[in-house]
Amino acid sequence: MTSKNSIQKALYLAFERLQWSELRDSVPLTLSEQDLENLRGINEKISLSEVTDIYLPLSRLLNLIVKAKQQRGLVVDEFLGQKPSRSPYIISIAGSVAVGKSTTARILQALLRHWPEHPKVDLVTTDGFLYPLADLKRKGLLQRKGFPESYDMKMLVEFISAVKSGQPHVKAPIYSHVTYDRVKNQHQTVSQPDILILEGLNVLQTGLDSPVDTRRPFVSDFVDFSIYVDAEEPLLKQWYKERFLQFRSGAFSDKKSYFHHYSSLTDDEANTIAANIWDTINGPNLQLNIQPTRERAHLILQKGQDHLMSHVLMRK
């Protein structure tokens, strides 16, 4: 049987942290400590050195790739004798709950905006494409929230297709982590960005993963470059529990919060409930639907203790 390590060696170039950091090639750091503070997620200790060592080389790589795609587009337009077309470069960021996808996406957005070739960088999370809470309850999917079947994939694919085709104004639904639901009558408008970053649990899924229809398009069909943020499951579970405990005095403390009843839990009670949520929902979703898509990514960011990147794997 082929091992995971042998597959990764065949598909990827592997870099230790120091090796990867040397590929920065004098790209300037454009973020301050205050900028970084605004970009951090709950329970993440990311530092400017993490940005310098990991994200600056990655932003340089993406800049080179996007420029090459733009040049190729100009060649095709010239060959066809047509005016230059405007098709955004789409980057997807996948990974488990609590791995830090959102922080990775926000940092990349901030860095990529500083390159003159692509100053307009939009970020959309797939959370907004979860079915509304009432629909999830009606379909009996509340305990499957985050699983592929809990998303309105038709709406998501239509959105990403419209953005990719260059439509001038495309609306994406907005999700509230307070109400645990899609926000009614509010949208994020995406207007022909140079780059769109799409962040979510299952953005690497393909037709091969679908139990329903393997022929219909999937989000991954529209993505130009994909990133998977990885960590060992015991770490992910630990980070999820720590984040859950912090939410008690944060999001859960809001009386409008769907989870307000958790705000008064003791540490032991909160740990028990968080562990149960992981074991029954987030863990199985990771094992069944998210982790199996990892080797489809163009780049894998591997995290160790304290959310620090330890290795980077780049597709050959």
Curated annotation (Swiss-Prot):
Its main location: cytoplasm. It catalyses: (R)-pantothenate + ATP = (R)-4'-phosphopantothenate + ADP + H(+). The keyword Nucleotide-binding applies. One of its GO terms (cellular component) is cytoplasm. GO terms for biological process: coenzyme A biosynthetic process. This is Pantothenate kinase. HAMAP family: Pantothen_kinase_1. One of its GO terms (molecular function) is pantothenate kinase activity. PANTHER family: URIDINE KINASE. The lineage of its organism: Bacteria, Pseudomonadati, Pseudomonadota, Gammaproteobacteria, Alteromonadales. InterPro entries: P-loop_NTPase (IPR027417), PanK (IPR004566), PRK/URK (IPR006083). It comes from Shewanella baltica (strain OS155 / ATCC BAA-1091). It holds the Pfam family PRK. Pathway: Cofactor biosynthesis; coenzyme A biosynthesis; CoA from (R)-pantothenate: step 1/5. It is found in: Cytoplasm. Its EC number is 2.7.1.33. ATP binds at residues 95-102.
